[in-house]
């Protein structure tokens, strides 16, 4: 396997939403599916990726994961608040994290030049 190329750091902030289903989620997921799909299709260019969460080997959905590019966390939340899955109180909890896309297919490689540059950023530099 080849080494990944070094690519520029993404300038737009990225936010990871990890949503845990509440007890009525299965019914609400079906009831609001059409509206949810319409919303994510309308905003598809804001998503790095998104989808349901399941335990390995299970077909039962127990939450959702969404990675969103937005100018700031308030703008990311504005996108989420337009989604019927968020407005119907389907989720028991929602965690939001500021995320740096550091390596992978989406960024097209890795964003660091050397181990020292990663250490410097990890220490707040």
What residues fall within each predicted segment?
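Conserved, structured core segments of small domains
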Residues: 2-125
């Amino acid at each position: 396997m080849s080494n990944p190329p070094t690519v520029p750091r993404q300038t737009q902030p990225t936010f990871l939403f990890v949503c845990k289903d509440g007890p009525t989620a299965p019914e609400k997921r079906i009831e609001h599916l059409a509206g949810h799909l319409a919303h994510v299709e309308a905003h598809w260019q804001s998503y790095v990726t998104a989808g349901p969460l399941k335990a390995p080997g299970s077909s039962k959905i127990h939450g959702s994961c969404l990675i969103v590019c937005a100018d700031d966390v308030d703008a990311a939340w504005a996108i989420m608040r337009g989604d019927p899955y968020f407005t119907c109180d389907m989720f028991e909890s929602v965690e939001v994290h500021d995320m740096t896309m550091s390596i992978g297919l989406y960024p097209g490689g890795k964003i660091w030049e050397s181990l020292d540059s990663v250490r410097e950023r990890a220490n707040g530099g």
